[in-house]
């Protein structure tokens, strides 16, 4: 259920400041969004996977906290990030 190395590298290259920038809020939010989207497809097929759903909710909560932090510290990057990821807010 995790992302491939190539997919992670592509996300880091798209949202990071350089190729090794994995710690910035924008990159972390983009990686979590990709994982969440992948898991949503999984739960469409496996409706009774409650243990996995708990992990999904944990990821959504972590993404929400990172988005709140980004909004508090840099509103322009927050707006750009949610627009690029297609998140509603």
Curated annotation (Swiss-Prot):
Keywords: Ribonucleoprotein, Ribosomal protein, RNA-binding, rRNA-binding. The keyword rRNA-binding applies. GO terms for molecular function: rRNA binding; structural constituent of ribosome. The keyword Iron-sulfur does not apply. It holds the Pfam family Ribosomal_S15. One of its GO terms (cellular component) is cytosolic small ribosomal subunit. One of its GO terms (biological process) is translation. One of the primary rRNA binding proteins, it binds directly to 16S rRNA where it helps nucleate assembly of the platform of the 30S subunit by binding and bridging several RNA helices of the 16S rRNA. Part of the 30S ribosomal subunit. Forms a bridge to the 50S subunit in the 70S ribosome, contacting the 23S rRNA. Belongs to the universal ribosomal protein uS15 family. This is Small ribosomal subunit protein uS15. It comes from Mannheimia succiniciproducens (strain KCTC 0769BP / MBEL55E). The gene is rpsO.
